[in-house]
Amino acid sequence: MAEAETNPVLQVIPSDSPLKENKKYPPELLQFNGLGWRAYYHCHPASRAGDHRFKGEHGHFHIFVRIKDEPEKWSHFVALAMNNMGQPIGFFTVNQWVTGEEWESAKKLIKYLDDIPFSEQKEVVEMWLLSLLIINRDLIAAVLVERDNIITVKKGQVPDADIKKDKGLYLLSEVPLDYKKILI
């Protein structure tokens, strides 16, 4: 992408139309050769109340994984925040109501990191996203465990509530990317 003077965000947003907030890019989603992963990019209005943003975030990729025993069902895996230059700045997780997918425990989701079909990808953005998951395996595992811990704590505070549907609870966990730690 660097040689072509582009980045992952520019790769999924059409160059012939203006960026629209809350719209999924690409519209048909990234499909990863039908091998159990999918993703899309979008951004939110800066003024949206209760929204989470990393400092300097332009938008983010939501990444999903197909549930192995139920091939028609998908689970939100993690979101990847991107800055205005199209570079990744952090991973985060959101509550179930945000994306409406099936909920899988951190323990189950972490196992998917051991089975990423990287070598079978042909599209550059899909290879790039999967490579970030591989390189940041430990960070992603930690953010998923923290996500589940937050749900457990909240459930303890309000036992009868369905915490995963609580619209007052958007962000569950986050971790900024520190390239010095990743590359050393």
PLM region spans:
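Detector for Asparagine
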Residues: 7, 22, 33, 83-84, ...
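An exposed acidic His-Trp-rich patch
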Residues: 66-134
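Intrinsically disordered, low-complexity segments enriched in small/polar residues
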Residues: 38-39, 110, 168
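Long, compositionally biased interface segments
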Residues: 125-184
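Aromatic- and glycine-enriched beta-alpha-beta binding-site module
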Residues: 28-92
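N-terminal domain-onset segments
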Residues: 1-32
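Low-complexity, charged, repeat-rich alpha-helical/coil interaction segments
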Residues: 12, 33, 50-55, 85, ...
